Design a protein with these regions (language model features):
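Domain-scale recognition of functional cores that engage charged ligands
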Residues: 1-4, 11-249
């Protein structure tokens, strides 16, 4: 299954609407939602052609779960409906909303939307885990017999949804989870990096790296940045890992 993190608005892009509806300037006018959906359609076709036997084609389904936010849920859903789900089967496109948290000022004060009402904002990509459980998405995956999950963010126009190579590698190595990274183009590139803290892998935001840490070099096969593996929000999970390790904790 593919899980798309699409709770954000296009505000920083100068666009008033869900980020996935943003036109990135292609000659086709395709939006991010359109690109990702069309790639899944093509992947389904390729998988179907590859695994048919004796002239009988195999039914291939790759469900797309889209995590929205309360701010863009209805608009996102309507956009897919009005575009006939970009060729995907409607029953295989599932929308669910992440939670919200109170907005705080830099001094830790709760901000108000209006008198007696807290200003709220989506709870970030990490909100996917409680949202999957509360919305019934995890149960739906189990009911469908899904074992392998590819999760990625909407603002990656080059993403390969349900990436066969990435998922296949994780299956081959019997990984519970995986994280695809890109190497930083510059020591001070504004991107979080994969690191190790107290013996456990973690993501460190660029704002938390000192100048010395950002520029530190280590010798592997050749000199390279010690903190150069940029996190691009591109993850693999086995369903058992989510059920038994992530959700309970």
């Amino acid at each position: 299954a593919a899980v798309l993190l699409a709770g954000g608005q296009g505000t920083r892009l100068g666009f008033d609407g869900p980020k996935g509806m943003y036109d990135i300037g292609l000659p086709s006018g395709s939006t991010l939602f359109c690109l990702i959906s069309q790639r899944l359609v093509k992947l389904s076709q390729l998988a179907k052609a590859s695994h048919g036997q004796d002239g009988v084609s195999m039914d291939v389904k790759i469900p797309l779960y889209i995590m929205t936010s309360p701010m863009n849920h209805d608009e996102t859903k309507s956009y897919f409906e009005s575009n006939q789900y970009f060729g995907l089967p409607a029953e295989d496109v599932i929308f669910f909303s992440q939670g919200v948290l109170p907005c705080l000022s830099t001094k830790g004060k709760i901000l108000l939307e209006k008198p007696y009402q807290c200003s709220m904002a989506p709870d970030g990509n990490g909100g996917i885990y409680p949202a999957m459980e509360k919305s019934g998405v995890l149960a739906d995956m189990v009911q469908r017999g899904i074992l392998h999950i590819h999760t990625f963010a909407i603002d990656n126009s080059l993403v390969k949804p349900a990436d066969p190579n990435f998922i296949g590698y994780c299956i081959q190595t019997k990984a519970d989870c995986g994280n695809k990274v890109l190497w930083k183009s510059d020591p001070h590139e504004k991107v979080g990096v994969i690191a190790e803290k107290d013996g456990k892998p973690c993501v460190v935001e660029y704002s938390e790296l000192s100048k010395d840490m950002a520029e530190r070099l280590v010798l592997v096969e050749q000199e390279q940045l010690a903190f150069g593996a940029a996190n691009i929000c591109n993850h693999y999970y086995h369903i058992n890992f989510l059920q038994n390790q992530v959700i309970p904790n």
